[in-house]
Amino acid sequence: GLSLNCVGGFPPRAGRALTRLPGPAPPARAEAFALQAACRGSVGWLLACWKNGCTRERAQKALHTDGPFPGPVYAERLFASGAHVETLSSNSRTTEPEIAFTMARDLPKREQAWTVTEVLAAVATVHPSIEIVNPRLPKGFNDVVEWYVADGGLNHALVLGAGVKPLAPGDYAKITNSVSINGKLRSAGLGVNALGGTELARTSLASDLIDTAS
């Protein structure tokens, strides 16, 4: 199983909320991604991987977005199961069960979109994981999606469990995962809830990142 501990005293740049926004909201996703990239360049950390936020319809309704959005996960915020993950007492510390993929090869930009079959063929390992979500925005989870994108997809940290070999394509929708804190179930997930299956969410993320890089 996966486990983590959240303790206080983390540096402000990694978790402290802004008291005010730096300006008007980005007018569109493209500008929000550009702001996300600028923040990524200034933080001085190493980009390790990407998350795909709001893949569930329930989450999309809660955050008033019509689809998922990517966010960076830094090497400094990527942990193995059992690690101590530092947070501030003011952080939301929202924990969500996730499925993570490591890739055996890159998916370069091309004219036609990558198919689900092609994306799965590039997967090396599949991991149960826990994402710690923490908006740094003054309004928290009550802002426009462009600010969520700019705020690194609201990611604070990702905790990875042991990896397994890729599954059969039809099995990803059946994956179950849950988060318990101090023995109490906090949240549970089913693969089919993530855009119809975690393999579809993975393909969506790949397409988003390729489009953003164009």
Task: Report each predicted region and the residues it spans.
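Catalytic-core "active-site belt" of small-molecule-metabolizing enzymes
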Residues: 3-200
